[in-house]
Amino acid sequence: MNTTPVHALTDIDGGIAVDPAPRLAGPPVFGGPGNDAFDLAPVRSTGREMLRFDFPGVSIGAAHYEEGPTGATVIHIPAGARTAVDARGGAVGLSGGYDFNHAICLAGGAGYGLEAGAGVSDALLERLEHRTGFAELQLVSSAVIYDFSARSTAVYPDKALGRAALEFAVPGEFPQGRAGAGMSASAGKVDWDRTEITGQGAAFRRLGDVRILAVVVPNPVGVIVDRAGTVVRGNYDAQTGVRRHPVFDYQEAFAEQVPPVTEAGNTTISAIVTNVRMSPVELNQFAKQVHSSMHRGIQPFHTDMDGDTLFAVTTDEIDLPTTPGSSRGRLSVNATALGAIASEVMWDAVLEAGK
């Protein structure tokens, strides 16, 4: 779907092919030529298709190195926006983690890919002609996925790639699929022979004046599951043509009294952006609510073999109507309702990444 009109809640569908074609990642190499071995040139990522969204003040750019392949995706909010960070799992790759950001950088390359965020910071400083007044500081937070297992090089997103992703940023467009940070994302790592390539995904909803944009790069040990409970990406058995939920592999292992097999090197990174003003407590709870909801579309999620990070961002542009009965202590029913809707938008984004 290239355009997203104003939606009612009942219009959230998250449609995806019932039996998408297999996209096996192949066995990992865990090494190979690095950045210095190539004459690297950033490429603008266009992906499978372009999502069009209507969110003034928010631009997105994606760039990649074909030699990786690996990439970076930048969400740029020039005016800056308050941010809550929810990080879970056993191996989180995160820098910044600020409560106010001008850009969010998502990248491949594991910890090395955090350099892409430094490139975004450098570029923003140059745009301000190197002014460094405290109120003018440009804040960038970054999160990375471990994508080396799905490719045969040690190339990682560096400063030049982060700069390029920022330069490519435009309002109202997001490249779906194998693009930016999702170039070599994968899912279903019960066994390397059954791991499938995913990508990056986004979804957008507008409800009256309320805007919600979800962006995700699923690279989990788990599989991607649709709303019917069907595994649509990951843990694909080429001999049978069946995608299995990992729970069946784990059950068989316990029944046979052998350790369950699960491969390491997994992460899902995401951002949920809205224009609704929330208190700091509400924004933090909003982040937790949406992040927790993602276990429906990614199973299992937040494991010791993952390092999941979600950025919840608000541009603080509109206030939802309130009534004396709409709050419980410090938390508003409005924020809870917004989180419920945003959770569905995020599930749509996860499914887009799995197409």
UniProtKB/Swiss-Prot annotation:
Belongs to the peptidase S58 family. Keywords: Hydrolase, Nylon degradation, Plasmid. Changing residue 122 to N: Increases thermostability by 18 degrees Celsius. This is 6-aminohexanoate-oligomer endohydrolase. Involved in the degradation of nylon-6 oligomers. Degrades cyclic and linear oligomers of 6-aminohexanoate (Ahx) with a degree of polymerization greater than three by an endo-type mode. Cannot use Ahx cyclic dimer or the Ahx linear dimer. Changing residue 122 to G: Increases thermostability by 24 degrees Celsius. Increases thermostability by 29 degrees Celsius. The keyword Translocase does not apply. The active site is at residue 267. SUPFAM superfamilies: DmpA/ArgJ-like. GO terms for molecular function: aminopeptidase activity. Changing residue 137 to A: Decreases thermostability by about 10 degrees Celsius. It comes from the Bacteria. CDD domains: DmpA_OAT. Expressed as an inactive precursor that is cleaved autocatalytically at Asn266/Thr267 to generate an active enzyme composed of an alpha subunit and a beta subunit. Changing residue 122 to L: Increases thermostability by 13 degrees Celsius. Transmembrane segments: none annotated. It is an enzyme of class 3 (hydrolase). Its EC number is 3.5.1.117. Pathway: Xenobiotic degradation; nylon-6 oligomer degradation. One of its GO terms (biological process) is nylon catabolic process. It catalyses: [N-(6-aminohexanoyl)]n + H2O = [N-(6-aminohexanoyl)]n-x + [N-(6-aminohexanoyl)]x. Heterotetramer composed of 4 alpha/beta heterodimers. Exists at the monomer/dimer/trimer equilibrium in aqueous solution. Optimum pH is 6.5-7.5.
